[in-house]
Amino acid sequence: MLIYRPRERTPHVLKFASEPSTGEMEAILGGQFKNVPGFLSVEHEGIVHRCVALCAENGSDKKPPLNVAATILWDLALRRDLGIGLIGRNGTRADDLAGPVAIFFAN
C-alpha cells in the first residue's frame, strides 16, 4: 500500500501480511474513509498498476491540507483511464484530495 501525505512528494510504502482492518485504515487516513472515484491506476517505479485509492470522508468543518501529489496522480489516472482530468490548462482544479491518501494495487 502506498500512503501519500500532504506536503510530501514520495509515498510511504506499507506492507501488510493480510488486508488491513477498517480500524487500521481509519487510523492511517484520519477517520472514516471513501473510495476516490476514477482513481483506477497509478504509476509507481515506472510501472502502471491497476489500483483502488481511499481518502478520508472529510465530514468535519476542518478540511485537511491539500495533498498535491495525490491530486496530480488522480488527475493522471483520470486522463489515462477515462480521457478527462481534474486540472485545466489554466491550472484550475475541478476537485482535489486533502489529507492522507492510501493506494492499494489491484491483483
Regions found by a protein language model. Give the residues of each.
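Detector for the mature cores of small, proteolytically processed
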Residues: 1-107
